[in-house]
Amino acid sequence: MAQSIRLDRAGGARARIYQAALRLFAENGGSEIAVSDLADAAGIARGTIYNNIAAPENLLGEVAVALSHEMLLRTEATMQAFTDPAERMATGARLFIRRAAEEQDWGRFLVRFSHTHAVLQEAMREPPARDIKQAVKSGRFKIDAEKIPALLSMLAGATIAAMNAVIRGDQTWRDAGSHTAELLLRAGGVPPAEARRIAQRELPPLARAQHQPRKRKTS
C-alpha cells in the first residue's frame, strides 16, 4: 500500500487541512477553496482553519510548496545509492508516474497546476537537471550541452503526460513509466537496448522523507 501523503511535518490539524486542500484542488481544478468546504473535507471547525492558515486565499501556493518539498526529499532519499546519472534521471520520472497511479489526488494536483506554479516545476526539474548535466559532462549522454534545456523540457512534459494517461486509465504506470524513461534515455543518446534495460529495472519503493528546513518560495 502506498504511504499516505504527508504534506506537513508538524502533523495534526495543519496536515489534515493540507491533505483536504490537496484533494479539493485536484478534484475542482480551481485556485481557491471556500473555507466551509475545506472545513467539511478536513473534518474540522472553520475556526481551526483560520487558526492554522494565516491566509486561506494563498492555500494553493502553500500546498504546492509542501508537495514539492516532500517529493524532492523522497526522490533524493530513494536514489541515494544510484551512481549512474542516466539511471537516476529515468528512475525519477518513473517514481513520479507510479505515484500518480497510487495517489491519484496527488497526481491530479501536479497535472493541473505544474504549468502555473514554479515550485512544482522545481520538484520535477531540479534533480533531473543535475543528472542530465552530469551525464552530458561525463559523456554518458551523447548530446551537446546547449541541448540540455530541451531534454529537460522533454522530460517534464513527457512525465506529466504519462501521469495524466495513468490517471485516466489509458496506460498502466509500469508501461507508461518504462516507455517514457526508455524514450528519454534514447533522446540522451543511450543505445536502444541499454535504454530499455534501464527503463525496465525494478523500481524501488519511494523512501519516506527525512524532513529538513527549506526556504519557502512563492509562485
Can you describe what each PLM-predicted range is?
Residues 1-44, 58-61:
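Basic, helix-initiating cap at the start of DNA-binding domains
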Residues 1-2, 130-138, 168-219:
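C-terminal peripheral helix-coil segments that are non-catalytic and often amphipathic
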Residues 42-53:
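Short hydrophobic/aromatic patch on the recognition helix
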Residues 72, 91, 114-160, 164, ...:
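Amphipathic alpha-helical packing segments from all-alpha helical-bundle domains
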Residues 30-31, 54, 141-142, 171:
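Conserved hydrophobic residue
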